[in-house]
């Protein structure tokens, strides 16, 4: 599935968002057997207005034998705001963490960059193979680390949440996301299905992750302003953080 022929919103966004979107799809295509994941047609590409500015949202979704949904969302509000949002939702038959990554930028500056492989175990532990691989990564030092939100206890100890203050720090963040993705894809390929009992624990952990993410007031407020409360609720719970059955 070649993507090079499809024009993308990323061409109009901050360079780090374009680079990160390209990186995510490149690693996915390199390691995983992708097939399309079909969103409702009206939610693949959405346009609205926010405080007089045009709001555009572009969604791309895939699935694989190990992941029920791999979602890459790009959003742009006029020249004020650029957003990248990505989550990989594992199938609950596999004991895999949740990869999540967000970039928020505006007026040429990235104000927030977060990436994590978040545990689905309710005791907040990652699978041993992940713990080992992530521990072996170089320690990164960013000049402007940021504080996680109140609901941020879903994230792992390896989570990066920063305001990159230079091109060098942007490159560091991009490199770390690539490493997270490579660890994750290799972990997924090596994973075996779990027992029915373990699957129930994993489902509970994924539900906890999604319900905490749905509490993100900033995302909800932007969507409500542009499209109304009902639309925002539907988008939050069917596109961004739908709960596994």
Curated annotation (Swiss-Prot):
Q: Which residues cross the membrane?
A: none
The secretion signal range is none
Q: Name one GO biological process term.
A: phytochromobilin biosynthetic process
Q: Supply the enzyme class, top level.
A: oxidoreductase
- MF term (GO), any: cobalt ion binding
Instruction: Respond yes or no to whether keyword Ribonucleoprotein is given for this record.
Output: no
The protein's matches in InterPro entries, at most eight in alphabetical order, are given as: Ferredoxin-dep_bilin_Rdtase, Ferredoxin_bilin_OxRdtase
Name the domain of life this protein comes from. Bacteria
Q: Which Gene3D superfamilies match?
A: 3.40.1500.20
Listed under catalytic activity are: (2R,3Z)-phycocyanobilin + 4 oxidized [2Fe-2S]-[ferredoxin] = biliverdin IXalpha + 4 reduced [2Fe-2S]-[ferredoxin] + 4 H(+)
**Documented EC number(s):** 1.3.7.5
Which residues, by range, are in coiled-coil regions?
none
Keyword annotations for this protein? Oxidoreductase
A Pfam family reported for this protein in Swiss-Prot or TrEMBL? Fe_bilin_red
What's this chain's function?
Catalyzes the four-electron reduction of biliverdin IX-alpha (2-electron reduction at both the A and D rings); the reaction proceeds via an isolatable 2-electron intermediate, 181,182-dihydrobiliverdin.
Q: Indicate the family of this protein.
A: Belongs to the HY2 family.
HAMAP family to which the protein is assigned, alphabetical: Ferredoxin_bilin_red (MF_00618)
Recorded protein name is Phycocyanobilin:ferredoxin oxidoreductase
Kindly list the organism's lineage. Answer: Bacteria, Bacillati, Cyanobacteriota, Cyanophyceae, Nostocales
Write the gene name. Answer: pcyA
């Amino acid at each position: 599935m070649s993507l090079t022929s499809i024009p993308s919103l990323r061409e109009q966004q901050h360079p780090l968002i374009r680079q990160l979107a390209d990186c995510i799809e490149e690693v996915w295509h390199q390691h995983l057997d992708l097939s399309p994941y079909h969103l409702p047609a009206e939610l693949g590409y959405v346009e609205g207005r926010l405080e007089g500015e045009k709001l555009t949202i572009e969604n791309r979704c895939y699935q694989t034998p190990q992941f029920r949904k791999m979602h890459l969302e790009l959003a742009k509000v006029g020249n004020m705001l650029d957003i990248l949002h990505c989550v990989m939702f594992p199938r609950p038959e596999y004991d895999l963490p949740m990869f999540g990554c967000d970039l928020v930028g505006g007026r040429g500056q990235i104000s927030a960059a977060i990436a994590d492989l978040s545990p689905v175990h309710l005791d907040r532990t990652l699978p041993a193979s992940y713990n080992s691989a992530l521990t072996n990564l170089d320690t990164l030092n960013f000049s402007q680390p940021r504080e996680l939100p109140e609901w941020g206890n879903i994230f792992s100890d390896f989570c990066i949440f920063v305001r990159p203050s230079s091109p060098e720090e942007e490159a560091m963040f991009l490199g770390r996301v690539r490493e997270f993705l490579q660890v994750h894809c290799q972990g997924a390929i090596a994973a075996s299905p779990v027992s029915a009992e373990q699957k129930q624990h994993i489902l509970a952990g994924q539900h906890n992750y999604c319900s905490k993410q749905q509490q993100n007031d900033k995302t909800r407020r932007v969507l409500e302003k542009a499209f109304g409360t009902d639309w925002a609720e539907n988008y939050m719970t069917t596109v961004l953080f739908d709960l596994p059955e």
